[in-house]
From Swiss-Prot:
Name of the protein in its database record: Ras-related protein Rab-26
Organism for this UniProt entry: Mus musculus (Mouse)
Catalytic activity, EC: 3.6.5.2
Domain notes per entry: Switch 1, switch 2 and the interswitch regions are characteristic of Rab GTPases and mediate the interactions with Rab downstream effectors. The switch regions undergo conformational changes upon nucleotide binding which drive interaction with specific sets of effector proteins, with most effectors only binding to GTP-bound Rab.
Regulation: Regulated by guanine nucleotide exchange factors (GEFs) which promote the exchange of bound GDP for free GTP. Regulated by GTPase activating proteins (GAPs) which increase the GTP hydrolysis activity. Inhibited by GDP dissociation inhibitors (GDIs).
Reactions accelerated catalytically: GTP + H2O = GDP + phosphate + H(+)
Pfam short name (any one): Ras
Subunit record text: Interacts with ADRA2B. Interacts with RIMS1.
Record-listed GTP binding positions: 76-82, 99-100, 126, 181-182, 184, 212-213
Family of this protein: Belongs to the small GTPase superfamily. Rab family.
Tissue expression per record: Detected in zymogenic cells in the stomach.
Gene designation per UniProt: Rab26
Amino acid sequence: MSRKKTPKSKGGSEPATSTLPAAAAATNGPRLAHPRTVRPGPEAPPNGPPQSIRPSLGSTGDFYDVAFKVMLVGDSGVGKTCLLVRFKDGAFLAGTFISTVGIDFRNKVLDVDGMKVKLQIWDTAGQERFRSVTHAYYRDAHALLLLYDITNKDSFDNIQAWLTEIQEYAQQDVVLMLLGNKVDSTQDRVVKREDGEKLAKEYGLPFMETSARTGLNVDLAFTAIAKELKQRSAKAPSEPRFRLHDYVKREGRGVSCCRL
């Protein structure tokens, strides 16, 4: 089979409504007003799923039916790279390592309900000096996984600023999920699970806690995203609608021992 690019889509089925914060009001940092609901327009954005579903061959030799771009965003040090390596390679980057410079990506093909779904996962730098670089990649993203570190209160407090940035640069119907990472660090936890749940509910986001070290909920997070994107690309309107929030609540594994 010859190599070919996946064609662009003209639209997906019933894109979900995302609730995002209003723009930052102060120059001293992002202080949000009441969140506002952003509803997608009648036409799908240019980053939509493929128009037709025909097997394609990726650069690694893996065949896939449909491909999507997923971005990992959040402060530096929240574990974006470790989460990606755990999902892609089933390994954990132990010890110290150099933070991501700019942006990097890896591919993985999943079997989702009989369809080969390729996720092109972009790992972004969280440092402020690289923001102008990552902004350019938001526009083409189909999904965003927004991470904070449960042992770092600042990374949690900055989630609202990240949501403001997403509102400005990403597509209106981008799939969003909030992840509280490093849940294995029980003794160092400073952000309660309930706080993450409350914030996610405020902005209408699916939420779960993850651990790149143990693998807790890592595969589930990416699988849930793949299922949602696959559903949007489906041609048959009669197909039962996949509900991302319900799937995450049903399949997610809690860590009650880590609650404060």
